[in-house]
């Protein structure tokens, strides 16, 4: 199998937040990446796949049952086309010398990103320049989030950024299947929202709702 051309950013962050609030750190870091890419001109070609995957829109409209590229994350029956896996955000929380810290790794699939940029007519920065821009954007977003949590009472760690996060998750509002890690269906319905702890809300056809943590399920368009 050919190696994937990836850009990797590694950061050591020490946001001044409670350790229990680190649960939202992957989403906040992903927001920083997407904000940076949108500022470069990629607009609606990039987004976040819940909870913190980096995704891109496919070049050709999806056809239910049609052939899909290797990066596609949706079911074969889905017409949802914002399903190319473009990258990952990994966060390892640990005790630092001056309090809670996190080792953050952002990986970006460069061919997928380049395809999204080409569809927008955008020339990407040189590789090292792009790496620095992404790292700076992630660090700035985390600092902003930590400051929000420090200056206003928040019932959950996602609360200060939830509205902006909504706007970056293209799968919201679409029909999805919530699958256990071994592939068993846990819920099927509309991806109707997120709570202040980042849990996905799936509304079934009968109106019943389930709130599902990312540790327990993955969500795919159907």
What are these regions (language model features)?
Residues 1-16:
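Primarily the active-site beta-strand->alpha-helix module of PP2C/PPM metal-dependent phosphatases
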Residues 1-4, 53, 70:
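Generic structural signal marking isolated hydrophobic packing positions
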Residues 13-45, 57-222:
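Long, positively charged amphipathic alpha-helical accessory segments at protein N-termini or as interdomain linkers
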Residues 50-58:
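Beta-rich nucleic-acid/ligand-interaction surfaces
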């Amino acid at each position: 199998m050919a190696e994937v051309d990836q850009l990797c950013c590694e950061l050591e962050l020490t946001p001044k937040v409670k350790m229990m609030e680190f649960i939202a750190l992957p989403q906040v870091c992903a927001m920083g990446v997407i904000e940076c890419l949108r500022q470069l001109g990629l607009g609606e070609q990039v987004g976040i796949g819940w909870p913190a995957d980096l995704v891109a829109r496919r070049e050709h409209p999806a056809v239910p049952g049609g052939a899909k590229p290797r990066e596609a994350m949706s079911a074969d029956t889905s017409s949802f086309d914002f399903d190319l896996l473009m990258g990952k955000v990994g966060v390892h929380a640990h005790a630092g010398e001056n309090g809670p810290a996190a080792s953050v790794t952002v990986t970006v699939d460069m061919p997928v990103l380049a395809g999204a940029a080409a569809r927008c007519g955008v020339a990407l920065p040189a590789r090292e320049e792009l790496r620095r821009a992404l790292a700076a954007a992630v660090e700035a977003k985390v600092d902003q989030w930590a400051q929000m949590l420090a200056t206003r009472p928040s019932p959950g760690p996602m609360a200060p950024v939830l509205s902006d996060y909504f706007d970056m998750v293209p799968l919201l509002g679409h029909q999805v299947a919530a699958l256990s890690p071994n592939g068993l269906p846990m819920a099927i319905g509309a991806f109707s929202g997120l709570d202040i702890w980042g849990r996905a809300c799936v509304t079934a056809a009968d109106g019943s709702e389930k709130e599902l943590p990312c540790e327990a399920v993955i969500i795919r368009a159907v």
